[in-house]
Design a protein with these regions (language model features):
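Short, glycine/acidic-rich beta->alpha junctions
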Residues: 77, 169, 203-205
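The Walker A/P-loop phosphate-binding site
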Residues: 2-114
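Short, flexible loop motifs at catalytic/binding sites
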Residues: 23-27, 32-34, 141-143, 154, ...
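Short beta->alpha connector loops
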Residues: 75, 129-131, 200-203
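Phosphate-binding/switch region of NTP-binding enzymes
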Residues: 178-240
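A short acidic, amphipathic alpha-helical/loop segment
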Residues: 80-84, 135-137, 176, 208-211
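Conserved catalytic network of the ASCE P-loop NTPase/AAA+ motor domain
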Residues: 60-61, 87-91, 115-116, 138-142, ...
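Conserved inter-motif catalytic segment of the P-loop NTP-binding fold
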Residues: 72, 91-176, 180
Length: 240
């Protein structure tokens, strides 16, 4: 049962915060032997690139994973992710790129430079700033094999601005949405994998809530090698 609590700050309209009444009967504890999922959750999605060798021990992106790819400005995060999505799309996987930073013109120019990216369906989140939550929940519910989000920071800021809430509340919604969808909570019951793009600070530290780092299965880092167009990609955490 949800109760509505009104919060009012000086000079601002009151915010509505939902609180959930605790029901002890809803608590469940499982043994590993009691859990059951479709075997498809163990089938890696191959990109056919070198990325497969580090995405998992099974050589490919595993279903039902939410991972973060982080790096500094210009390190090539979006390029690497879009390349992965385009390769997966060419192999019949249903993919989605959620762009919180580029609009249609920017993406069109990007695809002009990288023609292979034209096959990737893209949601331009700037067109839905007043309905960020509703839009993302509706689209994700359609069912995808892989969804990439560029970037976590932009989605969190949009959510905070639209619903006049805190960063912790926005992060909680973001993580809960991905948790539900990756477990098959969508119309097609797909075990969706999420690739979340995030920047790092000038000092090279992760920019964002530590909760994001701890509540995701994998953390990947991209560094551009000085004096070349090559990039170094490595994982500091990968449960697959």
């Amino acid at each position: 049962m949800k109760n509505l609590v009104m919060q009012k700050k000086r000079g601002r309209k009151p915010k509505v915060k939902e609180t959930v009444a605790f029901d002890p009967k809803s608590v469940q504890i499982f043994k590993g032997s009691e859990l059951s999922f479709n075997e498809s959750v163990f089938r890696p999605m191959s990109t056919g690139t070198l990325m497969d060798s580090i995405l998992s021990t099974d050589k490919g992106l595993m279903p039902a994973v939410n991972m973060i790819i982080c790096g500094g400005p210009g390190s090539g995060k979006s390029t690497v992710v879009l390349d992965m999505l385009s390769k997966l799309a060419s192999k019949g996987k249903k993919v989605l790129f959620v762009s919180g930073e580029m609009d249609e013109i920017g993406h069109f120019k990007y695809c002009k430079r990288m023609p292979g990216f034209k096959v990737v369906p893209t949601l331009f989140l700037k067109n839905y700033t007043e309905t960020v939550r509703e839009t993302m929940e509706y689209v994700f519910d359609q069912g995808y094999d892989v969804i990439a989000i560029d970037s976590i920071a932009e989605v969190i800021e949009m959510f905070k601005d639209t619903y006049r809430t805190t960063e912790s509340a926005a992060v909680l919604w973001f993580l809960n949405l991905q948790s539900t969808v990756k477990k098959g909570g969508n119309k097609l019951k797909k075990y969706t994998s999420f690739i979340n793009i995030q920047q790092v600070t000038k000092a090279g530290d992760f920019a964002g809530s530590n909760r994001l780092k701890h509540m995701t299965e994998a953390m990947s880092h991209i560094d551009r090698i000085k004096g070349s167009d090559s990039r170094k990609v490595y994982f500091s955490k990968n449960r697959d």
